[in-house]
């Protein structure tokens, strides 16, 4: 096909549009065999011509848009062509035309592809600014875009505009509006043309959605500028450009009203944006004015809507009011126009309340109006009280919210006393249980009154209430306001002149009412007691004595009338307990304890009965002020009256009472009740966590007896729960086990959680023994599948065994054998089992320790075939590990004989295991190896046993691959096993080879240094030299990775500590140090894992005398330290970094103490190291990690250094400046030798700059106060040793801020440092 034919077929206006786009695609992909230079430019021009056709075959054909996008994204088009192509044919009319077709028939893929083309083209600023765009054209484009999204929002939820599209569209709109002579007018016109579509999209979204964020960003940055907001909000009301006029120009349906609050939020965000921007384009006063106008314009518009449903309009107004009340823009009082809008909202809300429509919305509206401007509502209090009276439900949360805000508003307006009077008058005319007696409202009022009412106001109110005729009426609400006022008083600040009023209430009302107390209704009885409780806290000694008769009368009536209601009984008991507490405080009870005992015991008895029909309170917001829940008395007894219970109740009664509470949780399945979030459970946790519980002996002992009693509970009553705490011992454990009920893990979990909170020292030895016995028995009753319950039990058992139990627990070894048997295949039990065994052995009585251990070993021998191997190995390991500390015990030969016999039997078991073909349990095999290791450490094995172990070792090596035992516990024990059996250089190197090999398999591996020390002690001189030389050869080879180096360095550290080969060969020391330093220069390794091991080797050598280290070795260590402190990359946790710094300081200490003769001439190196360490002591800012001219410790992250590291650094520098501290303890002022004096003088020539660095660091970094104080005291020692010339030199080297700090440093030294030394 010729070029002319090809172009004609593609551009033919009468040709098939589908064929043409296919041919254009082939041409672009190079599938047409024709030479066509600049074919991409030809295709773009063709596509622009076709896309502007008014036909759905082209402008909404995804093939055209996809091809355009592919070519435009390619690098085949020049920049000049792109600019000229869009200048000739803008994409705006093409996209508008496509949107017209998409409105009729939506195609999601085409719409998204057009958006991609728009971004791809106009994200280029050169193209954007040469494009011919007009505000009307762009506004129409944006309007149709929003309309399309709003109409097809369900299809586009997963395709919201990204940041690139949003930024591109913002640039396009800004370019269009700023091209006009008046950008403000263009922006206002843009909003006028697009507002309908914007609101249509807003009504389909909500705040926080991607489309809302998109509209918010576009309008904030492009349209709602400072000047546009002035035009919309601050122009004359008859202007057509006001916001209200723009909104009125749109026809609204009820659903569109949802968009108005969101549009209000966008406008408010725009005002906030201009206020908080860097340019600060508007002031706070201007922002407040704009916010008020924005609010009033929206409310005025909504009030003008007459044909829409009232409910929808009111909801919209409420949303706007709630946004307005919570913003932080408006300040001061409302202007006249806004105040008028608020009054209209008040009238509308009251009207709907009277009509009993939109109930909740109207109350929320009134609450919001109070928050906006309470001056609108407070003058209309009479109307508001009428609305309150119309509330028929006490739990109306919307009206309750309004009431609480009304109280706070009255307090702000300083008319809270008037509110109280109106409240008292209105509550008399309402039902007994009304919203004015709601508990939440009373609490809220009391909190406000406590800080708002003056003493004079309270005095006047109380006097008025006491003189009111209604106070003597029979209305049960007559005490509501009086009680609320009394509740707001605090004993620390109450007015003393109120006491006569309280006395008058007690005499004239309370005591008078007691004569006919049983005649009163339950609510009046409860309210009388509640008021009197508020008075009791202000009792004087005379008042408590005068009130004693009344209290006894009240209690006698309470005892006589068994059918009294719950609230009346509970409040009466609370009053009696409060009275007794005050009498104790005033010491007016004298010797009469009968009455307090009767009151407390009756309270315990009644609270237990109330719990039998357990029902928790609903939310407090639903309760009347006198309402109580059945557990309420229990809660106050647990958390407030515990001391009263301790003083006036017997231990038996307290135990029974605590048991009745705990049983509600323990027997949870019988109640079928979930108590996870219950008030009772939270207060129980508070009770068992309180220190007061354990300070009161009777409470503490009763709690522990209760837990024992719960564990002793029996379904067939074979064991009496009451007598169980006193009689239970280990002798009847079998009988007890057969009679106990199988409880669920939930039941046991309650006891365990309770035991966790009890301090171990609070539990007596006998109680610990009983608890241990019961917990062990319960563990047997739990299912084997309840691993979590078993582990929890074991942890509690271990906690209880930390302190000695009764001797019976240690007499019979069967107990410990039974305890170790569960979880034999679960490694999660192993750790806690080991701890339990060690505690048991530790607390064995020294007198019969040998007999018990021997008896235990004999039991193991007798039942070797019946007991699980895991149990045997666990007990055996713990026993053998304890033998070195128990060599002085009797029968040691018999014990060792039994140990070796059991060990031989275990070796036979392992040999039998190896002969089997099936797979082995790595856990079991690991435990068996651990036993062999423990016996090897005793170093008392016979040659026959050693031969067996060598044969076993060979057997494991032969089957190492088939065993597939690659788990960490087995590998650690296997390596230690070989280490303990090594008797030559080759054996030791084989152990090292195993360590390197398995280190790659399982990662970090730990080993016992003492075992390697034992292996080293068996090596001859030649074997030790042979082993260390081979290890050094490995370190210098290039075949090791970082894991190999880590293991080998640890082995070298063991050699350095425990072998004498380095003492014989100083050249060998230098080789080791060179190998360690080689690690830091190897670029293929990550040195973070190796530095710690290398520093351990350095530390070991520097702590030895100069016989070990030559001058070359000394220089090697200094070079290594400098290298570490200048590493570019090191990934470590802050804790590891602090450990590295500490080790570097320890190495410097070692050099200073043992190798000072080598330090001359190298002080500049030490200065560089100490300078890096000094800058590691300060807390770095994230933006200031490095300062020009300062060598920082690069790998050290900007985290705070632990204080003990700073102390070590200060100790090093102090010792350096006072060498006599190294040999003359606590004699800092003793005279120095000539050599020491020269050493200090040579040091200060360099350390004077360290002092200037410290001053400079204080001007750059924010140093922790404690760190700064330690460093300052430390540098006093440096300053003390400086000559006058050096002091002046330090001053010259500093800048102005550092000089100021230095001068203060010198003055403080002259004032404090010398005085401290004296």
From Swiss-Prot:
GO terms for cellular component: cytosol; nucleolus. Pfam families: Urb2. Its main location: cytoplasm. Required for 27S pre-rRNA processing. Has an early role during 60S ribosomal subunit assembly. It comes from the Eukaryota. This is Probable nucleolar pre-ribosomal-associated protein 2. It is found in: Cytoplasm, Cytosol; Nucleus, Nucleolus. It comes from Schizosaccharomyces pombe (strain 972 / ATCC 24843) (Fission yeast). Keywords: Cytoplasm, Nucleus, Ribosome biogenesis, rRNA processing. GO terms for biological process: ribosome biogenesis; rRNA processing. The keyword Protease does not apply. The keyword Nucleus applies. Signal peptide: none annotated.
């Amino acid at each position: 096909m010729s070029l002319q034919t090809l172009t004609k077929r593609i551009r033919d206006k009468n040709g098939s549009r589908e064929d043409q786009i296919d041919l254009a695609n082939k041409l672009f992909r190079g599938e047409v065999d024709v030479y066509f230079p600049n074919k991409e430019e030809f295709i773009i021009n063709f596509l622009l011509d076709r896309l502007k056709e008014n036909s759905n075959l082209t402008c909404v054909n995804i093939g055209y848009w996809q091809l355009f996008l592919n070519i435009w994204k390619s690098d085949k088009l020049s920049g000049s062509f792109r600019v000229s192509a869009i200048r000739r044919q803008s994409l705006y009319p093409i996209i508008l035309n496509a949107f017209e077709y998409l409105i009729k028939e939506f195609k999601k893929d085409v719409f998204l592809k057009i958006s991609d083309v728009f971004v791809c083209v106009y994200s280029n600023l050169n193209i954007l600014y040469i494009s011919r765009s007009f505000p009307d054209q762009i506004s129409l484009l944006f309007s149709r875009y929003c309309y399309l999204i709003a109409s097809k929002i369900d299809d586009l939820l997963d395709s919201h505009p990204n940041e690139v599209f949003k930024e591109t569209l913002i640039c396009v709109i800004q370019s269009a509006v700023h091209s006009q002579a008046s950008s403000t007018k263009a922006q206002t016109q843009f909003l006028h043309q697009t507002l309908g579509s914007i609101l249509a999209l807003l009504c389909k979204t909500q705040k926080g959605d991607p489309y809302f964020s998109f509209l918010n960003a576009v309008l904030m940055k492009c349209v709602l500028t400072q000047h546009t907001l002035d035009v919309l909000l601050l122009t004359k009301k008859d202007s057509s450009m006001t916001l209200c006029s723009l909104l009125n120009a749109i026809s609204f349906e009820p659903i569109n009203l949802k968009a108005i609050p969101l549009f209000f939020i966008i406008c408010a965000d725009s005002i906030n944006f201009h206020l908080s921007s860097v340019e600060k384009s508007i002031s706070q006063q201007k922002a407040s004015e704009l916010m008020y106008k924005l609010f009033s314009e929206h409310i005025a518009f909504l009030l003008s809507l007459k044909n829409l449903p009232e409910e929808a309009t009111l909801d919209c107004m409420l949303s706007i009011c709630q946004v307005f009340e919570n913003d932080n823009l408006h300040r001061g009082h409302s202007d006249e126009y806004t105040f008028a809008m608020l009054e209209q909202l008040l009238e509308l809300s009251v009207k709907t309340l009277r009509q009993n429509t939109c109930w909740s919305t109207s109350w929320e509206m009134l609450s919001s109006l109070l928050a906006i401007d309470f001056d609108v509502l407070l003058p209309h209090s009479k109307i508001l009280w009428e609305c309150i009276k119309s509330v028929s439900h006490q739990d109306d949360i919307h009206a309750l919210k309004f009431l609480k805000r009304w109280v706070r508003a009255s307090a702000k307006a300083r008319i809270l006393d008037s509110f109280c009077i109106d409240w008292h008058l209105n509550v008399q005319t309402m039902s007994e249980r009304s919203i004015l007696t709601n508990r939440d409202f009373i609490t809220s009022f009391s909190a406000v009154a406590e800080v708002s009412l003056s003493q004079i106001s309270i005095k006047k109110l109380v006097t008025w209430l006491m003189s009111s005729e209604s106070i003597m009426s029979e209305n049960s609400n007559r005490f509501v306001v009086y009680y609320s006022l009394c509740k707001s008083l605090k004993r620390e600040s109450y007015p003393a002149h109120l006491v006569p009023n309280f006395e008058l209430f007690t005499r004239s009302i309370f005591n008078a009412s007691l004569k006919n107390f049983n005649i009163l209704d339950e609510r009046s009885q409860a309210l009388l007691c509640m008021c009197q409780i508020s008075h009791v806290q202000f009792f004087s000694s005379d008042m408590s004595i005068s009130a004693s008769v009344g209290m006894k009368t009240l209690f006698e009536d309470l005892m006589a009338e068994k059918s009294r209601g719950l609230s009346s009984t509970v409040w009466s008991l609370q009053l009696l307990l409060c009275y007794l507490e005050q009498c104790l405080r005033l010491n007016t009870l004298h010797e009469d304890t009968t009455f307090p005992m009767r009151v407390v015991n009756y309270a315990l008895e009644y609270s237990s009965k109330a719990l039998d029909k357990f029902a928790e309170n609903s939310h407090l917001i639903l309760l009347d002020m006198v309402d109580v829940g059945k557990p309420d008395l229990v809660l106050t007894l647990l958390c407030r009256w515990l001391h009263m219970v301790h003083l006036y109740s017997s231990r038996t009664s307290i135990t029974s009472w605590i048991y009745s509470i705990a049983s509600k949780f323990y027997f949870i399945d019988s109640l079928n009740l979930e108590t996870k979030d219950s008030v009772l459970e939270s207060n129980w946790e508070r009770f068992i966590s309180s220190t007061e519980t354990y300070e009161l002996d009777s409470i503490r002992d009763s709690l522990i007896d209760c837990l024992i009693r719960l564990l002793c509970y029996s379904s067939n009553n074979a064991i009496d729960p009451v007598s169980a705490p006193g009689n239970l011992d280990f002798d009847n454990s079998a009988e007890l086990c057969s009679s106990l009920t199988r409880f669920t893990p939930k039941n046991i979990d309650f006891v365990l959680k309770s035991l966790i909170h009890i301090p171990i020292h609070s539990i007596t030895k006998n109680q610990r023994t009983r608890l241990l016995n019961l917990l062990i028995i319960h563990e047997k009753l739990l299912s084997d599948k309840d691993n979590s319950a078993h582990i929890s039990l074991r942890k509690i058992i271990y906690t209880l065994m930390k302190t000695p139990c009764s001797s019976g627990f240690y007499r019979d070894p069967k107990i410990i054998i039974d305890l170790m048997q569960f979880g034999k295949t679960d490694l999660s039990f192993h750790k806690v089992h080991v701890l339990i065994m060690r505690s048991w052995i530790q607390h064995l009585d020294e007198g019969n320790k040998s007999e018990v251990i021997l008896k235990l070993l004999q039991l193991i021998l007798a039942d070797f075939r019946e007991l699980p191997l895991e149990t045997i190995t666990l007990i055996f390991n713990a026993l053998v590990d304890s033998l070195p500390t128990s060599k002085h015990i009797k029968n040691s030969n018999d014990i060792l004989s039994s140990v070796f016999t059991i060990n031989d039997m275990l070796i036979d078991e392992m040999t039998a295991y190896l002969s089997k073909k099936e797979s082995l349990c790595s856990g079991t095999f690991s435990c068996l190896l651990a036993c062999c290791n423990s016996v090897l450490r005793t170093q008392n094995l016979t040659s026959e046993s050693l031969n067996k172990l060598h044969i076993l070792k060979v057997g494991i090596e032969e089957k190492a691959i088939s065993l597939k035992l690659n788990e960490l516990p087995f590998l650690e024990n296997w390596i230690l096993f070989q280490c303990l059996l090594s008797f030559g250089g080759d054996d030791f190197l084989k152990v090292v080879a195993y360590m390197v090999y398995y280190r790659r398999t399982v990662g970090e591996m730990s080993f016992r240094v003492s075992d390697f020390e034992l292996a080293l002690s068996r090596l001859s001189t030649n074997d030790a030299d042979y082993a260390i030389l081979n290890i050094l050869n490995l370190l210098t080879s290039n075949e090791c990775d970082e894991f190999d180096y880590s293991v080998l360095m640890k082995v070298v550290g063991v050699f350095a500590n425990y072998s004498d080969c380095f003492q014989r060969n100083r050249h060998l020391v230098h080789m080791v140090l060179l190998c360690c330093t080689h690690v830091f220069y190897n670029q293929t390794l990550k040195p973070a894992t190796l530095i710690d091991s290398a520093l351990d080797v350095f530390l070991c050598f520097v702590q030895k005398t100069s016989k070990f280290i030559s001058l070359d070795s000394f220089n090697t260590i200094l070079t290594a330290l400098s290298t570490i402190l200048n590493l570019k990359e090191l990934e470590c946790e802050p804790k590891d970094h602090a450990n590295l710094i500490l080790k570097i300081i320890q190495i410097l200490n070692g050099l200073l103490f043992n190798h000072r003769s080598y330090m001359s001439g190298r002080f500049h190196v030490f200065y560089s190291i100490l300078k890096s360490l000094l800058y590691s002591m300060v807390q770095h800012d994230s933006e200031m990690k490095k300062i020009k001219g300062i060598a920082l410790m690069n790998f050290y992250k900007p985290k705070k250094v632990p204080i003990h590291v700073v102390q070590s650094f200060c100790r090093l520098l102090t010792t350096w400046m006072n060498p006599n501290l190294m040999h003359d303890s606590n004699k800092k002022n003793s005279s120095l030798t000539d050599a020491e004096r020269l050493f200090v003088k040579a040091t200060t020539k360099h350390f004077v700059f360290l002092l200037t660095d410290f001053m400079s660091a204080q001007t750059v970094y924010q140093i922790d106060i404690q760190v700064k104080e330690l460093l300052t005291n430390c540098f006093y020692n440096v300053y003390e040793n400086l000559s006058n010339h050096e002091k002046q030199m330090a001053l010259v080297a500093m800048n102005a801020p550092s000089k100021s700090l230095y001068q203060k440093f010198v003055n403080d030294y002259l004032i404090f440092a010398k005085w401290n030394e004296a």
